[in-house]
Design a protein with these regions (language model features):
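PLP-dependent enzyme catalytic core of the Aspartate aminotransferase-like
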Residues: 4-5, 339, 348-358, 363-399
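Conserved core segment of the aminotransferase class I/II
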Residues: 6, 230-231, 235-303, 310, ...
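N-terminal small-domain helix-loop-helix segment of the aminotransferase-like
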Residues: 10-108, 115, 291-293, 393-399
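Helix C-cap/helix->beta junction micro-motif
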Residues: 37, 144, 204-205, 319, ...
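Conserved PLP-anchoring active-site segment centered on the Schiff-base-forming lysine
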Residues: 119-141
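Active-site phosphate-binding strand-loop segment of PLP-dependent enzymes
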Residues: 149, 153-222
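Conserved glycine-rich beta-strand-loop-beta hairpin in the small C-terminal domain of fold type I
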Residues: 288, 304-313, 323-335, 367
Length: 399
C-alpha cells in the first residue's frame, strides 16, 4: 500500500517532464545488445575522442594525485587554472583576459552551456538557437522556463545563420544568441568577419552572444579557427565556452571554461557556488599543464584526424555519395540519399551493417536529410565502416 501511495505522489516537475531521453544513451544500449549477440559494431556516431592525452599531461595528474593535500574540495582554489586559461588565450589568439574577473573554470563546458540559460533567462525570455545544433542550447533554455527560437543553418549559406532573417518579434524577447564554430554537427567554419557581424548584431539588439568553441584546435590542412574574443569589443556583449576535451584528448575528464563578459562570468560563478564543489585538483593540474605546455603534438594529432577524414570521404565519394570534407571538427555531415527520414535511415543502417552513425534530425529539424559520421576510431575501422555504408546504400539503390 505504501509503495503504491508513493508512486502516486511522486511526479516530476513540469520542466523535467518535457525532457526526452538522451539519444546517445538509448543508442548505446542498443549497440550493447547487438555486441552481446556477437555483432561487430563500428561506432561512427558519438564525438568522443579515442586518442589519449600525451604522457606529460598524465604525469601532471599522477604527480598531483600523489600529494595528500590535493584530496579535497577546490572551491576558491582554482586561480592557477584560470591563470593558465588566460595565458592560453593570450598565446593562441592574442586575446588579453583578466583571469580574476573574465575567466571561470567549469566541470566540463556542457555545465556552463546549461547554466548560462539558468542565470540569464526568466520565463518568457527567448534564446536564439541554431538548427541543427548541440541539444543543450535548447534544453537549457527550456528548463529555465524560456522559449527557443530556431535559426536555420542552411547549406546555401555555408551553414551560417542569416541574422537578417530573424523575426523582430523573436528579437524583442531574445536575451541569448548561440553560435558554435567550428560547428557540430555540420563541420562548418566561420571567419573573423562573420564574428564581427555577430558582435555588431548582438550589440544592436541587446543580446548576449554565446559562442561554443571546443573544436578550435581540431583543424585540417593548416586551418586554425579564430576565437570570437578576437573581435574588438566582444567582451562587452559575449562569452565563449571552451574545453580540454577535444583539444587535448581529455574527454571525460570534465574540465572546461567560460571567458568574456565579466558580469556574466560572475553570474555563472554565483550559480555554481550552490551547485558544485569545483574540479578535482589533479584534473586541474593536468589541464593547466596541457594549456601551458608543449602544443606541437597537436599537429600530429590533427594529421591523424585528417587521414581518417580523407579515408572516409574517399570511400564515400568512390561510391557516389557527395559528402564534403570538413576543414575542422570531428564530423562529416553527409546527405541522406533518397527520401527516407534520417532516423529510419540510420536505424536501418545499424541493423543491416552494424555501423552506427547519427541521424541529422537528432540535432534539429533542419538536420533532417543528413547523417553525421564521427572520425573517432582507428583509420582502418573507419574505412571499413564507410565501405559497409557504401555497399549497403548501393544494394538499396540509393547511390
Amino acid at each position: 500500500m505504501l509503495q503504491a501511495y508513493t508512486k502516486a505522489m511522486v511526479k516530476p516537475a513540469e520542466r523535467i517532464a518535457r525532457i526526452e531521453p538522451y539519444f546517445f544513451a538509448d543508442l548505446g544500449k542498443r549497440i550493447a545488445a547487438m555486441k552481446g549477440k556477437g555483432a561487430d559494431v563500428i561506432r561512427m556516431d558519438i564525438g568522443s575522442p579515442d586518442l589519449p592525452p600525451p604522457g606529460f599531461i598524465l604525469e601532471a595528474m599522477f604527480k598531483s594525485a600523489s600529494q595528500p593535500t590535493t584530496h579535497g574540495y577546490t572551491l576558491g582554489q582554482t586561480q592557477g587554472f584560470r591563470n593558465a586559461i588566460a595565458a592560453y588565450y593570450q598565446k593562441r589568439f592574442g586575446v588579453k583576459l583578466d583571469p580574476r574577473t573574465e575567466v571561470i573554470d567549469l566541470i566540463g563546458s556542457k555545465e556552463g552551456l546549461f547554466v548560462l540559460s539558468q542565470v540569464l533567462l526568466n520565463p518568457g525570455d527567448a534564446a536564439l538557437v541554431p538548427d541543427p545544433s548541440y541539444a543543450v542550447y535548447s534544453m537549457g533554455a527550456q528548463i529555465a522556463g524560456g522559449n527557443v527560437h530556431l535559426i536555420p543553418l542552411l547549406a546555401k549559406n555555408a551553414f551560417l545563420p542569416d541574422f537578417e532573417a530573424i523575426p523582430e518579434t523573436a528579437l524583442k524577447r531574445a536575451k541569448i544568441l548561440w553560435l558554435n564554430y567550428p560547428n557540430n554537427p555540420t563541420g562548418a567554419i566561420a571567419d573573423l568577419a562573420f564574428f564581427k557581424r555577430a558582435v555588431a548584431f548582438a550589440r544592436e539588439h541587446d543580446l548576449l552572444l554565446a559562442h561554443d568553441n571546443p573544436y578550435c584546435d581540431v583543424g585540417f590542412n593548416g586551418y586554425r579557427a579564430p576565437s570570437l574574443m578576437q573581435v574588438p569589443g566582444a567582451k562587452d556583449v559575449a562569452v565563449e565556452f571552451n574545453s580540454v576535451s577535444k583539444t587535448y584528448n581529455m574527454a571525460g575528464w570534465r574540465v572546461g571554461m567560460v571567458v568574456g563578459n565579466a558580469e556574466v562570468v560572475k553570474f555563472i560563478e554565483t550559480y555554481k557556488s550552490q551547485q558544485d564543489s569545483a574540479i578535482f585538483a589533479p584534473l586541474l593540474a593536468a589541464a593547466e599543464t596541457a594549456m601551458l605546455g608543449d602544443q606541437s603534438w597537436l599537429n600530429e594529432r590533427n594529421r591523424i584526424y585528417q587521414a581518417r577524414r580523407d579515408a572516409v570521404v574517399d570511400v564515400l565519394h568512390a561510391a557516389g555519395l557527395r559528402a564534403e570534407p570538413p576543414q575542422a571538427a570531428l564530423y562529416i555531415w553527409a546527405p541522406v540519399p533518397g527520401s527516407e527520414g534520417s532516423m529510419d535511415f540510420c536505424a536501418k543502417m545499424l541493423e543491416d551493417t552494424a555501423v552506427s552513425t547519427t541521424p541529422g534530425v537528432v540535432f534539429g529539424a533542419h538536420g533532417e536529410g543528413y547523417f553525421r559520421i564521427s572520425l573517432v576510431g582507428e583509420e582502418e575501422r573507419l574505412r571499413e565502416g564507410a565501405s559497409r555504408i557504401s555497399e549497403w546504400m548501393q544494394k538499396r539503390g540509393l547511390i
